[in-house]
């Protein structure tokens, strides 16, 4: 099951072009292709290699633009709902924990992140700027702004 660091293309586009060529990076981290072929893909970050910003990862998945606004395989863009699922439901599935986390439901751990605004109301190009107001993990507040 692929679990790519979704911001690699955002931060390292030029290195990928140098190593793989322009044509091959267009398909890299191809969540749209995963879906088309019935592959479940989970999204991740890879600290300290890249910042641990899931919202930057969401932005990259939805826009397929690097940090300079250059396109990286627009055909691999996914809707925001699919990108969120890759970080939540599919992330739990990847770690064999789908029975205890990944969704908000009775009997689940109830891990949750609260953003300062409705992500679906934000321009996709601005997702990386959205702040996290609160994070609850294992019933404990682990981040509060």
Predicted regions and their residues:
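His/Asp/Glu-enriched, well-ordered alpha-helical/loop segment
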Residues: 1-121, 125, 130-138
């Amino acid at each position: 099951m692929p679990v790519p660091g979704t911001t690699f293309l955002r931060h390292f586009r030029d290195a990928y072009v140098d190593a793989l060529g322009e044509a091959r990076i267009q398909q890299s981290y191809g969540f749209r292709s995963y879906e088309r072929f019935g592959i479940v893909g989970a999204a991740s970050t890879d600290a300290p290699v890249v910042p641990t910003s899931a919202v930057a990862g969401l932005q990259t998945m939805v826009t397929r633009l690097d940090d300079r606004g250059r396109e990286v395989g627009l055909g691999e863009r996914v809707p925001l709902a699919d990108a969120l699922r890759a970080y939540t439901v599919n992330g739990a599935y990847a770690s064999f924990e789908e029975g205890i986390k990944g969704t908000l439901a009775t009997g689940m751990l109830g891990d949750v992140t609260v953003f300062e605004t409705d992500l679906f109301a934000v321009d996709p190009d601005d997702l990386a700027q959205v702040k996290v107001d609160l994070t609850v993990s294992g019933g404990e507040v682990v981040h509060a702004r």
